[in-house]
């Protein structure tokens, strides 16, 4: 009897692992159907008790695997651009630009995961699927990310994604009007504006 129970437990574990593997493969395949796109987005940040901390909106351009332009237009403007090698963050309010090597950028943020769609990075998460909804839990619980969810249709259209941090703060993004089309290369180049300070972390 004990042997049967043990076998049953092992089989259940195998089924869970297969489900995680299938969900991960499905998510990667869906995201892989779209190489480049443009969309507008809204952002809502809430505390662990559900209180709204910040609301914002902006525009997003992506060309996988390493090119993107994330332009937050409100409540405060900020620009995050990857040209494939350097990650540029521009804050017009403080007139400062920070430059980092893209290869050094963390892969455990939802946006970087979506943009890169790298199998090695996805393997660091347990992934479950319900229809178009995917939920990801990091294998490494020591990080700041507690849970990440994304809704992506079978044709690769991202409808929304959100991240919950260990302290319960949630950042939710709703994408609207995604256009799966060619994006001009100029969107992924960054020219240092006159009069701003450059904090170059690539040294």
Curated annotation (Swiss-Prot):
<dbReference type="InterPro" id="IPR029046">
    <property type="entry name" value="LolA/LolB/LppX"/>
</dbReference>
<protein>
    <recommendedName>
        <fullName>Outer-membrane lipoprotein carrier protein</fullName>
    </recommendedName>
</protein>
<dbReference type="Pfam" id="PF03548">
    <property type="entry name" value="LolA"/>
</dbReference>
<dbReference type="GO" id="GO:0042953">
    <property type="term" value="P:lipoprotein transport"/>
</dbReference>
<dbReference type="InterPro" id="IPR004564">
    <property type="entry name" value="OM_lipoprot_carrier_LolA-like"/>
</dbReference>
<dbReference type="GO" id="GO:0030288">
    <property type="term" value="C:outer membrane-bounded periplasmic space"/>
</dbReference>
<keyword id="KW-0653">Protein transport</keyword>
<feature type="signal peptide">
    <location>
        <begin position="1"/>
        <end position="21"/>
    </location>
</feature>
<keyword id="KW-0143">Chaperone</keyword>
<comment type="subunit">
    <text>Monomer.</text>
</comment>
<dbReference type="InterPro" id="IPR018323">
    <property type="entry name" value="OM_lipoprot_carrier_LolA_Pbac"/>
</dbReference>
<keyword id="KW-0574">Periplasm</keyword>
<comment type="function">
    <text>Participates in the translocation of lipoproteins from the inner membrane to the outer membrane. Only forms a complex with a lipoprotein if the residue after the N-terminal Cys is not an aspartate (The Asp acts as a targeting signal to indicate that the lipoprotein should stay in the inner membrane).</text>
</comment>
<dbReference type="GO" id="GO:0044874">
    <property type="term" value="P:lipoprotein localization to outer membrane"/>
</dbReference>
<keyword id="KW-0732">Signal</keyword>
<comment type="similarity">
    <text>Belongs to the LolA family.</text>
</comment>
<keyword id="KW-0813">Transport</keyword>
């Amino acid at each position: 009897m004990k042997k049967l129970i043990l076998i049953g437990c092992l089989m259940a574990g195998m089924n869970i692992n297969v489900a995680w593997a299938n969900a991960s493969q499905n998510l990667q395949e869906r995201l892989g159907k779209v190489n480049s796109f443009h969309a507008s987005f809204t952002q809502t940040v809430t505390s662990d008790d559900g209180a709204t901390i910040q609301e914002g909106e902006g525009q997003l351009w992506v060309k996988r695997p390493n090119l993107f332009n994330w332009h937050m237009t409100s409540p405060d403007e900020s620009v995050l651009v990857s040209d494939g090698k350097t990650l540029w963050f521009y804050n017009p309010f403080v007139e400062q630009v920070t430059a980092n090597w893209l290869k050094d950028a963390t892969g455990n943020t939802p946006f970087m995961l979506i943009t890169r769609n790298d199998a090695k990075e996805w393997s660091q998460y347990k992934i479950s699927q319900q229809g178009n909804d995917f939920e990801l839990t990091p294998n490494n619980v020591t990080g700041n990310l507690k849970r990440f969810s994304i809704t992506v249709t079978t044709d690769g259209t991202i409808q929304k994604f959100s991240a919950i941090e260990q302290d319960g703060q949630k950042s939710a993004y709703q994408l609207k009007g995604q256009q799966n089309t060619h994006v001009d290369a100029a969107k992924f180049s960054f020219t240092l504006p006159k009069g701003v300070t450059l904090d170059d972390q690539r040294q």
